[in-house]
Amino acid sequence: MKPLLIFDLNGIFLVRQRGATSHKPDFTIGAFKCYVRPGVRRFLKWAHHHFDVAVWSSTMPHNTIPIVKYIWGKKMKDLKFIFSQRHCTQTGTMPCGKPIFLKELKYVWEMFPWYDETNTFLIDDSPHKVVNNPPHTSIHPEPLTFETRHVPIDLKNHLSHLQPL
């Protein structure tokens, strides 16, 4: 069995920008202009070859699904699951009024018992979202921002050592 990689979306594969910008987005969802990081599709082809792949975003479902459809296209069917905000645990609210969410892997392991803390890795740019998970079950790359949106994805080095022998 392949290890499971669970990817966040915003900050990993794309950046969402609200409001006016002179830069043409790759696609738009509601008020958000979305910019996909270069090399994402090539990286995902590699990831799907070596790992089981899933998505867990803290965005609302009506935003999560269109983003996944855009990034994965017809390969969306190869995802083991797609979790959204409704699968997160809300723990409070930021001063700006935005909710604070956790991504608790115990829910993944309850639904998919063949995965556990030895073969599951959550890739998320927000370390605070995984504080209730066992150690060594998450990787936190530098977040993609509007200013760095042209920087190609570079996660293979982080993930190559996780591949089964």
Predicted regions and their residues:
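Alpha-helical substrate-recognition element adjacent to the catalytic core
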Residues: 1-96
